[in-house]
């Protein structure tokens, strides 16, 4: 059975970590979809490179059953999370992580 992974990318994201995940999934035939933890699909890496994610985290809510695992790709947005915790996309982030956890799904991530 094919596996499918939801990849969360904060804004800004650690591009090195994100691309290591994506390359590993690609090379191993694992399907994935990248969700920006943002109001828009357009995000940046810590070094300022612009990226376009597949979708935004708000659209992952309610679709957790379509994925076997959740991968969290950290970045410079995390150290200032407390200042932005009330933003809708960060509220969605916490809800999605909780839902994946409640369903006993695999969750991994990194912070660098």
Q: Which residues does each predicted region cover?
A:
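Extended, subdomain-level signal for the structured scaffold at the beginning of enzyme domains
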Residues: 1-103
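Catalytic nucleophile serine of serine hydrolases
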Residues: 109-112
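Active-site cofactor/cluster-binding pocket
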Residues: 106
């Amino acid at each position: 059975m094919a596996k499918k992974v939801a990849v969360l990318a904060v804004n800004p994201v650690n591009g090195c970590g994100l691309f290591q995940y994506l390359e590993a999934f690609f090379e191993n035939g694992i399907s994935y979809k990248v969700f920006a933890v943002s109001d828009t699909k357009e995000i940046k890496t810590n070094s300022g490179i612009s990226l376009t994610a597949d979708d935004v985290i708000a659209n992952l809510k309610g679709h957790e059953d379509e994925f076997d695992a959740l991968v969290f790709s950290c970045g410079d947005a995390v150290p200032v999370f407390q200042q932005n915790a009330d933003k809708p996309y960060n509220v969605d982030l916490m809800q999605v992580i909780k839902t994946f956890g409640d369903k006993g799904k695999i969750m991994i991530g990194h912070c660098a």
